[in-house]
Amino acid sequence: MDTETGGLDPAQNPITSFAAVVLDFNTLKEVDRWETYVKPYNDLQITKESIQKTMVNMAEVNRGMELNAFIDAFMRFCTQNFADTKGKDQRRLVAVGHNVMFDVGMLEAAFYYSAYGKKQSLFNYIQDQTLDTMYLSKMMYGLTGDEKMTLGATCERAGIILTDAHGAMNDV
């Protein structure tokens, strides 16, 4: 999963877009995908720097989902894709992404700012343990921390062509 945001601080900057892909862990085949823009909410600011870095189309963002509709759709997406096939328990999504705790923090703040406030938790839908491709890359390539750890640099090391970075679905 990936979020694009109006800045780096969940208390001051909103999510502007979100994307997720569901994979079958046995076959690694895509099961579902979802991408959406999210309208700015709670008077949070979208910085000029984030607009330049992500090249976000503000017209698309302003036509995006309202925050409460986004949270409702996120919960539905998780539930329909991760419900136990026997109907006993709802399993929770394993959040996978590059520097994924940033995305988790942004989603957690969005839940808080929504009409659900503290009544509904992001962690009812995703596990509190994540799989971070940035850390996997460090381990796989024996990196010490001084190297560039962006998604683009990681893809280059792995021989993956990353086009249009900072588009939520492209980064997934």
Task: For the regions a language model picked out, list residue spans one by one.
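Acidic donor-binding loop at a coil-to-helix junction in glycosyltransferase catalytic cores
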Residues: N170
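Short alpha-helix plus adjacent loop in nuclease-associated cores
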Residues: D128-D146
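A generic structural signal for secondary-structure junctions
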Residues: F111-Y116, Y141-G142, E156-G159
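Substrate-recognition/cap helix-loop segment adjacent to the acidic, metal-dependent catalytic center
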Residues: D103-Q129
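Juxtamembrane/interfacial segments flanking transmembrane helices
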Residues: E147-L151
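Conserved non-catalytic scaffold segment of RNase H-like nuclease domains
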Residues: M1-E108, G152-I161, H166
